[in-house]
């Protein structure tokens, strides 16, 4: 017979690193070119004028200006714009 108990095992004990997603700059706020506006998975927000989209769907400002959010179209698509100053 075994003189020691067998070691227990667990199937939990893992967690993923936080991804820091969300809106980083809000409507009416001034941004400089290259500033990140939204970090997202998929296109919850779409790029409007003067806004670019990175390969991970991050939205960023292409020019210095003021941010505005708008709901466009029949599908109520949320779009982000930057109005140059």
Swiss-Prot record:
The keyword Methyltransferase does not apply. Residues 1-21 are annotated as: Disordered. Residues 1-10 have a biased composition (Gly residues). GO terms for cellular component: cytosolic large ribosomal subunit. InterPro entries: Ribosomal_bL27 (IPR001684), Ribosomal_bL27_CS (IPR018261). GO terms for molecular function: structural constituent of ribosome. Disulfide bonds: none annotated. Keywords: Ribonucleoprotein, Ribosomal protein. It comes from the Bacteria. PROSITE patterns: RIBOSOMAL_L27. One of its GO terms (biological process) is translation. Pfam families: Ribosomal_L27. Belongs to the bacterial ribosomal protein bL27 family. HAMAP family: Ribosomal_bL27 (MF_00539). This is Large ribosomal subunit protein bL27. It comes from Leptothrix cholodnii (strain ATCC 51168 / LMG 8142 / SP-6). The gene is rpmA.
